[in-house]
Amino acid sequence: MAKQSNIRNFSIIAHIDHGKSTLADRILDVTGLVTERDKRDQYLDRMELERERGITIKAQAVRIPYKAADGREYVLNLIDTPGHVDFSYEVSRSLAACEGALLVVDATQGVEAQTLANVFLALDHDHEIIPVLNKIDLPSSDIARVKAEIEDGIGLDAAEAVEVSAKTGLNVDKVLEAIVERLPAPEGDSDAPLQALIFDSWYDSYQGVVVMFRVMHGTIRKGDSIQMMATGKKYEVTRLGVFSPEAKDVDCFTAGDVGFLCAAIKELGDAKVGDTVTHSSRPAATPLPGFKEVKPMVFCGLYPTDSSEYEQLKYALEKLQLNDAAFSFEAETSQALGFGYRCGFLGLLHMEIVQERLEREFNIGLIATAPSVVYKVLTVDGEEKYIENPAALPDPTKIEGLYEPYVRMEIHVPNEFVGNVFKLCEEKRGIQKDMRYLAVNRVIITYELPFAEIVYDFFDKLKSLTRGYASMDYEIIDYRQSNLVKLDMLINGDPVDALACIVHRDKAYYQGRAIALRLKRTIPRQMFEVVVQAAIGNKIIARERNAPLRKNVTAKCYGGDITRKRKLLEKQKEGKKRMKRMGNVELPQEAFLAALQVDDE
């Protein structure tokens, strides 16, 4: 193993699309780790979906041997991280395993919201940060402006920033030299009791759970008996290895090393991310500080379109949960949709990706209900409940107070679009908290908003109102009491639980009317009348009807008495009544999305 003073552990942090994964590819090229034959874009993004969308979802760790200009052999452990706000927990786990970070900033775009959010995460871990300006080969790059933004907005010295083009490979060797010269070597005592931090884990069908970890103190060897400090479970290490970039076995790790271990661990819950691995014979006195447990904040119901696929959906969800600590699910039933699962996600991108993976990797047709956030209810008895499904809201007479989650959001926007952003945030019940200038024409606006207002289309609207120039980052701060009501949708007098939603009373009438109108358009006409109603409690606030399709029963009557025609029409009317009583309305998937798209009306 390499000497501790010659190890450098670092991660690459950046806003989404600023070129992290491309820079990681070039570093692998320059160090000769990836052969010409194996080359592909986004080498570290293993998931097909990651490469297709051009985003990083799971953090990846790779060991890079590097011979520096001073002639010494170094080991660089690169931990690639995602940039999207939904996956910021993946970033914080990766940073806990490093001593330093490369901050990649797009020289054409400048400092953006998630750049700042990730920098503050890195500073929380006392990291040394090296600014890297990417895309300097583009004619639209403005190096001087971006350096000024880094100095004013973040407070880093940009004079030392490395200017690169990850696409062409220009100056990537300078980045490697900067890592060796400016980032500190890991500290830690190899003779102390073992303390190793788990920063990622996933399930392998042959080896059980594979644990990615960073040794802080002590030494770990193949065959050692280890213990997880959070769960107390004991295992024997069957395999130790590193990704370089493909898996290679090693015999032992000492303080400062990053690698993976297999120990026939059956369940992902037994090797939790943030837990500490120690020896069972000589355990460490205290565990390492881990990460706070991530809680899903957006919930939606997932139902198989074919009810016979219910067990298959359960298997698929369990399989996805093995590799995704932040995803949760539990069984639920709906009168309208049958048996399905209530799933919890970190945000909307996370939800989209899970849905897409279920449909693509497991070939299951899904119906998804409208996403909702977690509300807090204070009952008359003084009991606190958290409500993930609007249909589970208690009777209004039993509710003392209804609380919704609020987020603090930072929006970075060019000067000319500030008015549009204010207007959007006011519409979404936002409270302005702060506004400051990052540069002459770039503003950071801070708002506090109800999470429910931003969960569906806020980001899309923000992008279109600012021509794609705005970027945002948010964190959940607290629960606040609001004037909220449950809006029920009724089809022919029967409430459809999957369409129920919790809305602010001021918006309930408009929202109810808009959903009813949209449902009227999406539900196909039947042989009987279909009435769509929106209700708050027992009060109907909106009503739409789809007229029945009717056969011209009097077509065969040529002339003759009017009573003959009337008799046929009365007979048809009776039949329609019976049909309406007996008939079921088939709701298409679009009907469930109707509840989401009401703001466009």
Curated annotation (Swiss-Prot):
Record bears the keyword Membrane: yes
Classification via SMART domains: EFG_C
Pfam families, A to Z: EFG_C, GTP_EFTU, GTP_EFTU_D2, LepA_C
Catalytic function, reaction form: GTP + H2O = GDP + phosphate + H(+)
The UniProt record lists the keyword Nucleotide-binding: yes
Superkingdom to which the source organism belongs: Bacteria
Domain tr-type G: 5-187
GO biological process, one term: positive regulation of translation
Membrane topology value: Peripheral membrane protein
UniProt-listed InterPro entries: EF-4 (IPR006297), EFG_III/V (IPR035647), EFG_V-like (IPR000640), EFTu-like_2 (IPR004161), G_TR_CS (IPR031157), LepA_C_sf (IPR038363), LepA_CTD (IPR013842), LepA_IV (IPR035654)
Gene Ontology MF term list: GTP binding; GTPase activity; ribosome binding; translation elongation factor activity
Subcellular localization(s) per the UniProt record: Cell inner membrane
Any GO CC annotation of this UniProt entry: plasma membrane
Family: Belongs to the TRAFAC class translation factor GTPase superfamily. Classic translation factor GTPase family. LepA subfamily.
Alphabetized NCBIfam families for the sequence: lepA, small_GTP
Protein name per Swiss-Prot or TrEMBL: Elongation factor 4
